[in-house]
């Protein structure tokens, strides 16, 4: 495994440890296992206030030291009466810090403070209209009858002393509650999800009016502080970055270059599975437009040789990853030595891969595991790097905002997500030079046409997949026996779930006509109408 420093978040490039205005206000989310915990943090940040997801096990004393402006208790899959139901430190209620419990978080608040939670007579899942009993404070500017997203089987039936009902639904008497004197609030619905009509109004009320936060978490402030922190951490040492061409690594390269200049070396390994024209365009943008030198490594023949005869998708991924490591090792030694490895780790990676619990012995928050970038995971032990991860506190949409603010071109900022193994896993079956050329040309038709028609940004992803079969066709009064191509176009907010796109038939027709006429070896185009779930975005 990659030998990196994993001390308790020691001087990471993040806004919570900088000692400036970015860290003075933070709202923390205690995570009880909700699928929406990350989304709550994103919604808070949309108000330009910093937010982090941390473990529900964090003690009241540790929260006191962190000194957040507010605390949110997430939802979760458990019932508060389950034998092993997760519970927070009950001293949290006595900190004098505003608390908002969401769904399970509200039920836990009620139970710990002496109220009663029972299995609901009528479980609520989906949209429900709320009727407001007290329009002040938390529910200011939330409309009567507003639609909110419900997902609960338990309900609060008796409130603790001092609490009052703020809103109800047809099936839930306590849809929103408050103890105004102690600034404790709860909602049975999920204001963070897009289906909740006035959810953001409620969140803004909690952030601005109840927690008294100011909008200081801005793109400009982050860029300024990130550059300062990179300089402070790296000093005069050298940094290596494996550039992929995506928005994350490109933004990271720009920030690092602004901070340390020629101490940065960007390495781009061309494994031969990129989209048409992308390797050349990447080097052109960085070399000519931004004057950031890129060490271009042409390893196409090595990678395709490794995949001869391989059809299993997991074996493809393994071999590509292994060969990338081999090339990376050789080239880093040739270009080095380096002290730091820069990675485009984002906040969702931190949430997924690092336990943000506190160490029971030291009281410090410890990263138990660092999730390596798909390109550099499993590097040999003798490559000893310290990590620098300036983007580790950002969500994807925040990275795009940073990229725009520092002047990266739209073609990078709005670039559709692309898998690490590239076109190799969009070719079902064996990868050959011939099949790569077919798919690369077919994929180019898709991208070129949606850009021409001005709808590129309407899709989360739009691409072609080459199947390991042939189909009969007729072209020029002659029988053909050629490849069918699958057209995959999807919409999504974050890639976690996705829906198949409903583009105009005229667009589908144009793409199909262009493919069979312009791409040698293709005589049929089919459209994938599978959402995620049950399918995945990629075919392999």
Swiss-Prot record:
Superkingdom of source: Bacteria
Gene Ontology cellular component list: cytosol
Extent of the signal sequence: none
CDD domains: GATase1_GMP_Synthase, GMP_synthase_C
Enzyme active site: 103, 190, 192
EC numbers for this chain: 6.3.5.2
Catalysis: reaction(s): XMP + L-glutamine + ATP + H2O = GMP + L-glutamate + AMP + diphosphate + 2 H(+)
SUPFAM superfamilies per the UniProt record, alphabetical: Adenine nucleotide alpha hydrolases-like (SSF52402), Class I glutamine amidotransferase-like (SSF52317), GMP synthetase C-terminal dimerisation domain (SSF54810)
Record bears the keyword Aminoacyl-tRNA synthetase: no
Binding site for ATP: 244-250
Function: Catalyzes the synthesis of GMP from XMP.
Quaternary data: Homodimer.
Protein's UniProt name: GMP synthase [glutamine-hydrolyzing]
Source species: Picosynechococcus sp. (strain ATCC 27264 / PCC 7002 / PR-6) (Agmenellum quadruplicatum)
Gene for this chain: guaA
